[in-house]
Amino acid sequence: MTGLLERGEGRLGLFGFGSSAHMILPVAVRRGLRVYVFTRSTSKAEAAPKMGAEWAGAPMAEPPCKLDAAIVFAPAGWVAVEALKKLEKAGRLVLAGIYMTPIEKLEYKLLWHEREMKTVANVTRQDVREFLEEAAKAGVRPRVTIYPLEQANKALIELKQRAPPGSLVLMVS
């Protein structure tokens, strides 16, 4: 996706630190990447270095260095603009969400110097197999909190107030 995993070196930014980023972080670290996490959640920012991130902070914060690539999981267009600002020349930005609010006022200078922005629309079964194999080697163990469908409101409140690590799943019985 970003080209960094294939090289086995570089500085990767993860914007949004939910389920997907939690699984990508240890894989990227295992492959030799230096990972920088951007999240609005204080608790997630505190957890990221414990999982191997070099640095963690808010999306508007300046990391200690420019990034070679970044993946935006957050569904907010303004976060993509912030990610572009943090890229090195010829850096690649991957928009990984299936939905995002509009990206407003994108200044051309953020794309200048051969920066690249792409989306991820299709993932093949082989892509998933390869990632799961790599994730297992990196010791990734997804964290899942299961709620019965009848407790959906409780799950949403918990997600908003506490944002537990990993995924919340509603079980339909």
Locations of the language-model features?
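Mid-domain Rossmann-like dinucleotide-binding core that forms the NAD(H)/NADP(H) cofactor-binding site
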Residues: M1-M60
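C-terminal hydrophobic helical "lid"/dimerization subdomain
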Residues: R30, R125-S173
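N-terminal Rossmann-fold cofactor-binding loop
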Residues: F38-T42, F73, A121
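Helix-to-beta-strand junctions that scaffold the AdoMet/dcAdoMet cofactor pocket
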Residues: L87-K89
